[in-house]
Amino acid sequence: MREIIHLQTGQCLIQGNQVGTAFWQTIHHEHGLDHDGYFRGESTQQSDRLSVYFAEASNNKYVPRAVLVDLEPATMDAIRSGPLGNFFRPDNMVHGQSGAGNNWAKGHYTEGAELVDQVLDVVRREAETCDSLQGFQITHSLGGGTGSGMGTLLIAKVREEFPDRMMATFSVLPSPKVSEVVVEPYNATLSVHQLVENSDETFCIDNEALYDICRRTLKQAHPSYGDLNKLVSRVMSGLTTGFRFPGQLNADLRKLAVNLVPFPRLHFFTVGFAPLTTAAAYQNLGVAELTQQMFDPKNVMSASDFRNGRFLTCSAIYRGKVSTKQIEEQIRGVQAKNSAYFVEWIPNNVQTAHCSIPPVGMNASSTFIGNSTAIQDIFRRVGDQFSVMFRRKAFLHWYTGEGMDEMEFTEAESNMNDLVSEYQQYQDAGMDDDEAEEAYEEEEPVEE
């Protein structure tokens, strides 16, 4: 079976460990497992591909293939005392004592570097239990110190050790309005610099977009972090449907990348989910309503409006008892109506997949993954904030004090500016632009 090892780094609120734990809470229900990891499901479809994310331990108990990491003990204590306390393997929880103090350099070079070998031992042990490891997925935040600094260190080290395995990241980006840390632009830019080189696919999620969905669409006046994490876990559950249940398309991380990444550096995706309705207004939505909601910019979970750019590729994953014929018709309709938002020089750039098993508590749902040039809005915004601070050398001593060099900041800024330019270049490319088409044909990957 094609196993995936899940890593979650950084703490609290809407960061790696909380988002990761919400994901496990969602998928263990879908697969019919109880809080202790015993299978209580009714259908073989629930258990057929359990081994992708779960290892079978002795006495028929299933344990997540998960490694939980933080630089301070509080997060692990909270998970141990929570509803999934008995679910995770206790020796897969690795933590330091001091925290990263929202400093990327501490997570990447000092505190995190001291802990990383211990984490890699656990990762190796997990990899040895796999028959055919397809890759890794990591949940982390780019605004703090641990998720960003240590998260990217871990990605680089795992990449070094498993160079031919896939690396997917669920990265929570800082948002313009919901900011908790003054040095977020530094931490995020230094992280993106690493992700461009070391990740195969990065799903971008942003706090502000999640808050907006909770307030505007779900009518929650004061959304809690639990509400935000639940939204992210729904998207993660939708994205991984093809890996966990029988289906035709995007059946593993590599196929997902083949379908969505036309150029290796441009692997940053926006994601969306439907139905997003208040509990009171919930009704059975058909394919048409799901498609309409899913392509609504208000329901995209990152603060970039795809109408400001063009889709290079995108994928729609439907779940539940819905008609495949209707799905094809609706997607064709969306493309015809919004043809200006799709590049015309990548043929068949919209993929659809269908899985008959709906999420728990719903009859049908759809998940959207878009590789849109509009994602440059996020990088441009963070880059502008970075420049303002870096020109004044604000707070730089926090980083140089941990052994970092100013040159690293300059390189990270330059790499992110290049990324923005590349997205812009392919946004502007038209049918008559031979360069873009030739570049695409050269880069086009071959499926294994």
UniProtKB/Swiss-Prot annotation:
SMART domains, per the entry: Tubulin, Tubulin_C
Keyword Ribosomal protein: no
Gene Ontology molecular function: GTP binding; GTPase activity; metal ion binding; structural constituent of cytoskeleton
Stretches for region Disordered: 424-448
Biased composition (Acidic residues): 430-448
Cofactor: Mg(2+)
Positions of GTP binding: 11, 72, 141, 145-147, 207, 229
UniProt xrefs under Pfam families: Tubulin, Tubulin_C
Keyword Metal-binding tagged: yes
Example of a GO cellular component annotation carried by this entry: cytoplasm
Domain of life of the organism encoding this protein: Eukaryota
Keywords: Cytoplasm, Cytoskeleton, GTP-binding, Magnesium, Metal-binding, Microtubule, Nucleotide-binding
Subcellular location: Cytoplasm, Cytoskeleton
InterPro entries given in the database record: Beta-tubulin_BS, Beta_tubulin, Tub_FtsZ_C, Tubulin, Tubulin/FtsZ-like_C, Tubulin/FtsZ_2-layer-sand-dom, Tubulin/FtsZ_GTPase_sf, Tubulin_C
Binding site for Mg(2+): 72
BP GO terms, sorted: microtubule-based process
Family in the record: Belongs to the tubulin family.
Subunit structure: Dimer of alpha and beta chains. A typical microtubule is a hollow water-filled tube with an outer diameter of 25 nm and an inner diameter of 15 nM. Alpha-beta heterodimers associate head-to-tail to form protofilaments running lengthwise along the microtubule wall with the beta-tubulin subunit facing the microtubule plus end conferring a structural polarity. Microtubules usually have 13 protofilaments but different protofilament numbers can be found in some organisms and specialized cells.
Function summary: Tubulin is the major constituent of microtubules, a cylinder consisting of laterally associated linear protofilaments composed of alpha- and beta-tubulin heterodimers. Microtubules grow by the addition of GTP-tubulin dimers to the microtubule end, where a stabilizing cap forms. Below the cap, tubulin dimers are in GDP-bound state, owing to GTPase activity of alpha-tubulin.
Stated name of the protein: Tubulin beta-1 chain
Biological source species: Colletotrichum gloeosporioides
Highest classification ranks of the organism: Eukaryota, Fungi, Dikarya, Ascomycota, Pezizomycotina
